[in-house]
Amino acid sequence: MTTTRVLVNDIELPTATTHGGGGTLALLTLDNGADHKIPTTLSPDTIAELTGVLLAQRARAQAGEIVALAVTGKPYVFAAGADLKRVSQVRDRDQALALGRDGHAAYSLLADLGVPTFAFINGVALGGGLELALACSYRTISGSVHAVGLPETSLGLVPGWGGATLLPRLVGIEAAIDIILTKPAANRQVSSHEAALLDLVDVDLDPADFLERSIVWAAGVLRGDIVVQRRELDDAAHWDAVVAAAKTRLD
Protein backbone atom coordinates (compact mmCIF):
# COMPACT_ATOMS: atom_id res chain seq x y z
CA MET A 1 0.00 0.00 0.00
CA THR A 2 1.28 3.46 -0.94
CA THR A 3 0.71 5.95 1.87
CA THR A 4 0.47 9.65 1.15
CA ARG A 5 2.93 11.67 3.21
CA VAL A 6 2.82 15.36 4.10
CA LEU A 7 6.12 17.03 3.21
CA VAL A 8 6.95 20.49 4.57
CA ASN A 9 9.22 23.09 2.97
CA ASP A 10 9.72 26.73 3.91
CA ILE A 11 9.41 29.24 1.07
CA GLU A 12 10.71 32.78 1.44
CA LEU A 13 8.09 35.02 -0.11
CA PRO A 14 9.03 37.77 -2.55
CA THR A 15 8.81 41.36 -1.35
CA ALA A 16 7.58 44.46 -3.13
CA THR A 17 9.58 47.69 -3.20
CA THR A 18 6.54 49.79 -2.33
CA HIS A 19 4.69 47.62 0.16
CA GLY A 20 7.39 45.45 1.69
CA GLY A 21 5.96 42.07 2.62
CA GLY A 22 7.93 38.86 2.46
CA GLY A 23 8.19 36.39 5.29
CA THR A 24 8.06 32.61 5.33
CA LEU A 25 5.33 30.47 3.81
CA ALA A 26 5.13 26.84 4.96
CA LEU A 27 4.46 24.75 1.84
CA LEU A 28 2.87 21.35 2.47
CA THR A 29 3.10 18.83 -0.38
CA LEU A 30 0.96 15.69 -0.46
CA ASP A 31 3.03 12.92 -2.05
CA ASN A 32 2.79 9.13 -2.05
CA GLY A 33 6.15 8.62 -3.74
CA ALA A 34 4.61 7.19 -6.93
CA ASP A 35 3.94 8.77 -10.31
CA HIS A 36 0.60 10.24 -11.34
CA LYS A 37 -0.74 6.82 -12.35
CA ILE A 38 -1.16 6.11 -8.63
CA PRO A 39 -2.95 9.23 -7.35
CA THR A 40 -2.39 10.48 -3.83
CA THR A 41 -5.25 9.60 -1.50
CA LEU A 42 -6.01 10.51 2.08
CA SER A 43 -5.88 7.52 4.41
CA PRO A 44 -6.42 7.67 8.18
CA ASP A 45 -2.62 7.60 8.53
CA THR A 46 -2.31 10.59 6.19
CA ILE A 47 -4.99 12.50 8.08
CA ALA A 48 -3.18 11.78 11.36
CA GLU A 49 0.10 13.02 9.89
CA LEU A 50 -1.61 16.11 8.46
CA THR A 51 -3.07 16.86 11.89
CA GLY A 52 0.37 16.68 13.49
CA VAL A 53 1.92 18.85 10.79
CA LEU A 54 -0.80 21.49 11.09
CA LEU A 55 -0.48 21.59 14.88
CA ALA A 56 3.25 22.17 14.49
CA GLN A 57 2.67 24.91 11.91
CA ARG A 58 0.08 26.57 14.15
CA ALA A 59 2.73 26.78 16.88
CA ARG A 60 5.14 28.31 14.35
CA ALA A 61 2.49 30.83 13.32
CA GLN A 62 1.93 31.81 16.94
CA ALA A 63 5.69 32.28 17.31
CA GLY A 64 5.79 34.53 14.23
CA GLU A 65 7.94 32.08 12.26
CA ILE A 66 5.54 31.79 9.31
CA VAL A 67 3.14 34.30 7.75
CA ALA A 68 1.10 31.80 5.72
CA LEU A 69 0.66 28.14 4.85
CA ALA A 70 -0.08 26.52 1.51
CA VAL A 71 -0.99 22.99 0.43
CA THR A 72 -0.24 21.45 -2.96
CA GLY A 73 0.27 18.00 -4.45
CA LYS A 74 2.71 15.96 -6.46
CA PRO A 75 2.73 16.51 -10.26
CA TYR A 76 -0.75 16.30 -11.82
CA VAL A 77 -2.50 15.39 -8.55
CA PHE A 78 -3.59 17.61 -5.67
CA ALA A 79 -5.42 14.81 -3.85
CA ALA A 80 -7.88 12.26 -5.20
CA GLY A 81 -9.96 11.96 -2.05
CA ALA A 82 -10.16 9.50 0.79
CA ASP A 83 -8.43 6.14 0.48
CA LEU A 84 -11.41 4.04 -0.61
CA LYS A 85 -9.64 0.78 0.22
CA ARG A 86 -9.46 1.90 3.83
CA VAL A 87 -13.03 3.21 3.72
CA SER A 88 -14.21 -0.22 2.54
CA GLN A 89 -12.65 -1.73 5.66
CA VAL A 90 -14.93 0.27 7.96
CA ARG A 91 -17.04 -2.30 9.78
CA ASP A 92 -19.15 -0.38 12.27
CA ARG A 93 -20.64 2.99 13.15
CA ASP A 94 -17.86 3.93 15.56
CA GLN A 95 -15.20 3.44 12.89
CA ALA A 96 -17.22 5.49 10.41
CA LEU A 97 -17.69 8.30 12.92
CA ALA A 98 -13.98 8.31 13.76
CA LEU A 99 -13.09 8.58 10.06
CA GLY A 100 -15.37 11.57 9.61
CA ARG A 101 -14.40 13.29 12.84
CA ASP A 102 -10.66 12.91 12.26
CA GLY A 103 -10.95 14.52 8.83
CA HIS A 104 -13.06 17.36 10.18
CA ALA A 105 -10.60 17.94 13.03
CA ALA A 106 -7.63 18.09 10.67
CA TYR A 107 -9.32 20.43 8.20
CA SER A 108 -10.63 22.66 10.98
CA LEU A 109 -7.03 23.38 11.95
CA LEU A 110 -6.64 25.24 8.65
CA ALA A 111 -9.27 27.73 9.81
CA ASP A 112 -7.62 28.01 13.21
CA LEU A 113 -4.01 28.33 12.10
CA GLY A 114 -3.66 32.02 12.88
CA VAL A 115 -2.30 32.87 9.41
CA PRO A 116 -3.89 32.81 5.93
CA THR A 117 -3.96 29.42 4.20
CA PHE A 118 -3.77 28.70 0.48
CA ALA A 119 -4.60 25.67 -1.67
CA PHE A 120 -2.44 25.48 -4.79
CA ILE A 121 -4.56 23.05 -6.84
CA ASN A 122 -2.01 21.69 -9.28
CA GLY A 123 -3.97 18.63 -10.42
CA VAL A 124 -6.88 16.31 -9.72
CA ALA A 125 -8.83 17.45 -6.65
CA LEU A 126 -11.67 15.10 -5.82
CA GLY A 127 -13.68 14.32 -2.71
CA GLY A 128 -11.58 14.88 0.39
CA GLY A 129 -8.97 16.55 -1.81
CA LEU A 130 -11.38 19.28 -2.86
CA GLU A 131 -12.66 19.52 0.72
CA LEU A 132 -9.09 20.16 1.84
CA ALA A 133 -8.87 23.01 -0.66
CA LEU A 134 -12.25 24.38 0.46
CA ALA A 135 -10.98 24.51 4.05
CA CYS A 136 -8.23 26.95 3.01
CA SER A 137 -8.62 30.72 2.93
CA TYR A 138 -7.69 31.06 -0.76
CA ARG A 139 -7.40 28.78 -3.79
CA THR A 140 -5.33 28.92 -6.98
CA ILE A 141 -5.70 26.35 -9.76
CA SER A 142 -3.56 25.27 -12.68
CA GLY A 143 -5.14 25.87 -16.07
CA SER A 144 -4.48 22.23 -17.00
CA VAL A 145 -6.69 20.75 -14.28
CA HIS A 146 -9.76 18.96 -15.63
CA ALA A 147 -11.05 16.99 -12.63
CA VAL A 148 -12.32 18.94 -9.64
CA GLY A 149 -15.37 17.73 -7.78
CA LEU A 150 -17.16 15.81 -5.07
CA PRO A 151 -18.05 12.50 -6.76
CA GLU A 152 -18.86 10.58 -3.56
CA THR A 153 -22.60 10.37 -4.25
CA SER A 154 -21.93 8.18 -7.29
CA LEU A 155 -20.43 5.66 -4.84
CA GLY A 156 -23.32 5.88 -2.39
CA LEU A 157 -21.38 8.19 -0.05
CA VAL A 158 -21.76 11.84 0.94
CA PRO A 159 -19.01 14.49 1.20
CA GLY A 160 -17.97 13.81 4.78
CA TRP A 161 -15.21 16.33 5.48
CA GLY A 162 -17.09 19.59 5.10
CA GLY A 163 -17.80 19.80 1.38
CA ALA A 164 -21.58 19.65 1.73
CA THR A 165 -21.56 22.85 3.81
CA LEU A 166 -18.48 24.72 2.57
CA LEU A 167 -19.23 24.40 -1.15
CA PRO A 168 -22.71 26.02 -1.20
CA ARG A 169 -21.42 28.88 0.96
CA LEU A 170 -18.79 29.55 -1.68
CA VAL A 171 -20.57 28.95 -5.01
CA GLY A 172 -24.26 28.99 -4.06
CA ILE A 173 -26.72 26.14 -3.63
CA GLU A 174 -27.52 25.63 -7.33
CA ALA A 175 -23.89 25.22 -8.41
CA ALA A 176 -23.17 23.11 -5.32
CA ILE A 177 -26.03 20.70 -6.11
CA ASP A 178 -24.70 20.41 -9.65
CA ILE A 179 -21.20 19.54 -8.39
CA ILE A 180 -22.34 17.19 -5.61
CA LEU A 181 -25.26 15.40 -7.31
CA THR A 182 -25.81 16.12 -11.00
CA LYS A 183 -22.27 15.92 -12.36
CA PRO A 184 -21.33 12.70 -10.52
CA ALA A 185 -24.49 11.04 -11.87
CA ALA A 186 -23.24 11.84 -15.38
CA ASN A 187 -19.62 10.91 -14.56
CA ARG A 188 -18.51 14.51 -15.07
CA GLN A 189 -16.32 16.86 -13.05
CA VAL A 190 -15.39 20.55 -13.10
CA SER A 191 -12.48 21.94 -15.13
CA SER A 192 -10.16 24.72 -14.00
CA HIS A 193 -11.98 27.19 -16.26
CA GLU A 194 -15.37 26.25 -14.84
CA ALA A 195 -14.00 26.38 -11.29
CA ALA A 196 -12.85 29.96 -11.85
CA LEU A 197 -16.18 31.01 -13.37
CA LEU A 198 -18.03 29.54 -10.39
CA ASP A 199 -15.72 31.28 -7.90
CA LEU A 200 -14.79 27.84 -6.61
CA VAL A 201 -11.20 29.07 -6.97
CA ASP A 202 -9.83 32.60 -6.77
CA VAL A 203 -7.52 32.53 -9.77
CA ASP A 204 -6.72 30.26 -12.74
CA LEU A 205 -2.98 30.29 -13.49
CA ASP A 206 -0.74 29.13 -16.34
CA PRO A 207 0.32 25.51 -15.75
CA ALA A 208 3.84 26.06 -17.12
CA ASP A 209 5.06 27.68 -13.90
CA PHE A 210 2.01 27.19 -11.73
CA LEU A 211 3.71 26.79 -8.36
CA GLU A 212 5.90 29.86 -8.84
CA ARG A 213 2.92 31.95 -9.98
CA SER A 214 0.86 30.71 -7.04
CA ILE A 215 3.56 31.75 -4.58
CA VAL A 216 3.82 35.20 -6.17
CA TRP A 217 0.01 35.52 -6.12
CA ALA A 218 -0.12 34.49 -2.45
CA ALA A 219 2.56 37.05 -1.62
CA GLY A 220 0.45 39.71 -3.33
CA VAL A 221 -2.58 38.75 -1.24
CA LEU A 222 -0.54 38.86 1.96
CA ARG A 223 0.85 42.31 1.09
CA GLY A 224 -2.62 43.61 0.26
CA ASP A 225 -1.73 44.24 -3.39
CA ILE A 226 -4.33 41.65 -4.44
CA VAL A 227 -7.80 41.83 -2.92
CA VAL A 228 -9.99 38.77 -3.44
CA GLN A 229 -13.65 39.65 -3.95
CA ARG A 230 -16.19 37.03 -2.87
CA ARG A 231 -19.82 37.08 -3.95
CA GLU A 232 -22.47 37.87 -1.37
CA LEU A 233 -24.81 34.90 -1.54
CA ASP A 234 -28.44 35.22 -0.52
CA ASP A 235 -30.00 32.02 -1.77
CA ALA A 236 -31.27 30.44 1.45
CA ALA A 237 -34.86 30.89 0.31
CA HIS A 238 -34.16 28.84 -2.83
CA TRP A 239 -32.53 25.82 -1.17
CA ASP A 240 -35.66 23.67 -0.90
CA ALA A 241 -36.69 24.36 -4.50
CA VAL A 242 -33.22 23.64 -5.89
CA VAL A 243 -32.90 20.40 -3.92
CA ALA A 244 -36.38 19.29 -4.99
CA ALA A 245 -35.57 20.00 -8.65
CA ALA A 246 -32.35 18.00 -8.39
CA LYS A 247 -34.24 15.05 -6.88
CA THR A 248 -36.73 15.16 -9.75
CA ARG A 249 -33.95 15.16 -12.36
CA LEU A 250 -32.13 12.25 -10.72
CA ASP A 251 -35.16 10.04 -10.02
Please describe what each predicted stretch is.
Residues S137-G160, A164, I173, D199-S214:
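Gly/Pro- and small hydrophobic-enriched strand-loop and loop-to-helix capping segments
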Residues V71, D83, L132-A133, A195:
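Hydrophobic/aromatic residues within transmembrane alpha-helices
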Residues H104, L110-L155, P159, N187:
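Glycine-rich beta-to-alpha active-site loop
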Residues K37, T72-A105, A125, S154-L157:
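Glycine- (often His-adjacent) and acidic-residue-rich active-site loop
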Residues K85-V90, E131, C136-S142, P168-L170:
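A glycine- and small-aliphatic-rich helix-loop capping segment at beta-alpha/alpha-beta transitions
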Residues M1-T72, S108:
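Conserved CoA-thioester-binding segment of acyl-CoA-metabolizing enzymes
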Residues M1-T29, A176-D251:
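Amphipathic alpha-helical segments at domain termini/boundaries
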